[in-house]
């Protein structure tokens, strides 16, 4: 007679062996082989099984144009389940780096229980063998018994998406994105955009700018965030364009950071020179999320977007010099093996303001430039760049903001002298701030303000000399132009006289 103790002993030994072999299999067998074996197993098992599998891809379209929001929400939901149940986890720093956030690692599975029903989530990665596309495609698979199909596809999935959204809002960390180079396809394994936490401290309160202009900017941004229904009513995509222009050091980048902090938006820093062509630019724009600011800094330098309708320059020699410089830069790029971007002006306009721009809402687009007159009018027209904001040199109102930020003072005996100088002298807020910043523990407000006064006086004298030199150069150019015109008129007169003599001689001959 078979004894119960022997049965239990046999069963326990068998289960222990199976658990051991399963652990070895998961730990040491490469995931490529595991994927293949598991696919074969599921196919065989599917003939006699009632299991259902639902696949959630990272990108919604076959060609990966737009990232799936459902995929991100499910990843958020699974992050809380993975910590306690998964064997392999991926650790990332959380907001403010105070703790770690654990999430499901690639090629790992985790169980979940909902209303007594057990389901299994697995994260897989598929890599194309096509050399032209070496990117990795991620997808999540939900597996469950067929008898629970209705409950899982309605109640459970609604629960997952709702919980994932709440977790995402709770753990949301604003990010600064930059586009990966089209030439570096391996970077695309993490998507078209790479990101780091956005932690810039700039605010409108600390921005060195005219108070009235700042308040107008804040009101404009608030109006935009509340304008979803209004934009739909008037038939426009929910986006707004800002053009920030002014000399270097006047706070254009700081303004963008202040806007992002004010709205609590992510920032996408789009580097056009690394974008392969117009098609790639569209994909990048589609892969940006709502509640974000897309920035193209120094757009006059990013690509040759200024020459299509460029105004004729005053001096031909300056134009020739610039053409020589451009040719030298192109030659240098070819020698380095760098590929030139094929993004065109029309391609950029279509990406930011064409049919494709309506694919995601609540988005702000910002261009910055040091030279407004260099830009093509089509690029900055009203309706495309709705708000043109001049970031000018530091005047007294902006100086008072900087003095409060750097020295924590709102009045001083030198303020009167400084007011006179900043109104007469063109100095950028960045240069003013550098003079106000204490260089040692001994530097107090008196020392810093005295240093600023001296710097302003030197800058004023320098500007005066430059103006005199420019005046002399202009006089020399005018003299050359008058001389050249006189020589041309003289040549023309001589030619007319020569033609007259020839005609006279021909008449005598006849």
Swiss-Prot record:
The keyword DNA damage does not apply. InterPro entries: AAA+_ATPase, AAA_N_dom, ATPase_AAA_core, Mitochondrial_chaperone_BCS1, P-loop_NTPase. It comes from the Eukaryota. It holds the Pfam family AAA. Keywords: ATP-binding, Hydrolase, Magnesium, Membrane, Nucleotide-binding, Transmembrane, Transmembrane helix. Residues 460-510 are annotated as: Disordered. It is a single-pass membrane protein. It catalyses: ATP + H2O = ADP + phosphate + H(+). The keyword Nucleotide-binding applies. Belongs to the AAA ATPase family. BCS1 subfamily. This is AAA-ATPase At3g28540. It comes from Arabidopsis thaliana.
């Amino acid at each position: 007679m078979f004894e119960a103790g022997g049965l239990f002993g046999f069963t326990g030994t068998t289960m222990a062996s199976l658990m051991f072999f399963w652990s070895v299999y998961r730990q040491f067998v490469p995931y490529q082989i595991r994927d293949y074996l598991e696919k074969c197993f599921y196919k065989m098992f599917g003939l006699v099984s009632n299991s259902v599998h639902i696949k959630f891809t990272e990108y919604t379209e076959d060609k990966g144009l737009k990232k799936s929001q459902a995929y991100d929400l499910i990843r958020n939901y699974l992050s809380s389940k993975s910590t306690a149940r998964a064997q392999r986890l991926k650790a990332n720093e959380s907001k403010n780096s105070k703790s770690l956030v654990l999430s499901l690692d690639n090629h790992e599975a985790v169980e979940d229980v909902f209303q007594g029903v057990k389901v299994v989530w697995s994260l897989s990665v598929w890599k194309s063998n096509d050399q032209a596309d070496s990117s990795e495609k991620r997808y999540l698979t939900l597996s469950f018994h067929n008898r629970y199909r209705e409950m899982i596809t309605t109640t459970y999935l609604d629960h997952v998406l709702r919980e994932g959204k709440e977790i995402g809002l709770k753990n949301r960390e604003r990010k600064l994105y930059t586009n990966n180079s089209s030439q570096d396809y391996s970077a695309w394994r993490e998507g078209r955009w790479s990101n780091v936490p956005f932690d810039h401290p700039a605010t409108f309160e600390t921005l060195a700018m005219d108070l009235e202009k700042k308040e107008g900017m804040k009101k404009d941004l608030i109006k935009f965030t509340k304008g979803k229904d209004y934009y739909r009513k008037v038939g426009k995509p929910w986006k707004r364009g800002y053009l920030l222009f002014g000399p270097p050091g006047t706070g254009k980048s700081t303004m963008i950071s202040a806007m992002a902090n004010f709205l609590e938006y992510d920032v996408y820093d789009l580097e056009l020179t690394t974008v392969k062509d117009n098609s790639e630019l569209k994909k990048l724009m589609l892969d940006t999320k709502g509640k974000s600011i897309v920035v193209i800094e120094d757009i006059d330098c990013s690509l040759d977007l200024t020459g299509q309708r460029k105004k004729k320059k005053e001096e031909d020699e300056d134009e020739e010099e610039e053409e020589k410089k451009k040719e030298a830069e192109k030659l240098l790029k070819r020698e380095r093996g760098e590929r030139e971007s094929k993004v065109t002006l029309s391609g950029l306009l279509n990406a930011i303001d064409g049919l494709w721009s309506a694919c995601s809402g609540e988005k702000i687009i910002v261009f910055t430039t040091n030279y407004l007159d260099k830009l093509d009018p089509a690029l900055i027209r009203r309706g495309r760049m709705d708000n043109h904001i001049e970031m000018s040199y530091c005047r007294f109102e902006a100086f008072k903001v900087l003095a409060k930020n750097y020295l924590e003072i709102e009045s001083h005996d030198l303020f009167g002298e400084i007011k006179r100088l900043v109104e007469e002298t063109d100095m950028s807020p960045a240069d003013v701030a550098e003079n106000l910043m204490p260089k040692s523990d001994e530097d107090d407000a008196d020392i810093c303000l005295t240093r600023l006064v001296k710097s302003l006086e030197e800058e004023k004298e320098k500007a005066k000399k430059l103006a005199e030199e420019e005046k002399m150069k202009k006089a020399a150019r005018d003299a050359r132009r008058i001389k050249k015109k006189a020589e041309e008129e003289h040549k023309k007169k001589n030619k007319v006289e020569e033609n007259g003599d020839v005609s006279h001689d021909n008449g005598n001959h006849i």
